[in-house]
Amino acid sequence: MPVHRFQNPPTIHAPRGYTHVVDATTPSRTVYVSGQVGIAQDGKIATDFRAQAVQSLENLKAALAAAGAGLEHVVKITNYFVDISHIAIFREVRDRYFDTKAPPASTAVQIVKLAMPELLFEIEATAVVPDGAGQVTTLAKT
């Protein structure tokens, strides 16, 4: 079973809601999740930042579940903000989803725009899953 070691070296400033270093040992498999945005399954886009952040994290959970993984397996997230001033709201939302005692490594980036003009936020993730954990859902191509 892999071990995730969450480390914050004393020679680096204290992190705010993330971990500086996550060391994941094998045997395990790595899951890469493409950027998830605030679009619900029915195609509706959430109208404000908080709702988009929540929907993005719900979509992330669903994507991980399809790979037999969960948020507890996430070792790194990258967050894209159209307006970085929303980071405090994101932190509130994020802390409802991730273990605040051992959060994943994290990067926040302000960008000019996302793929659709209504989108305000996107999150992508890397997860390390123990071999044999969870059921992988395989979807047939149509």
Where are the language model's segments positioned?
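N-terminal presequence-like segments and the immediate start of the first folded domain
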Residues: 1-58, 62-75, 81-142
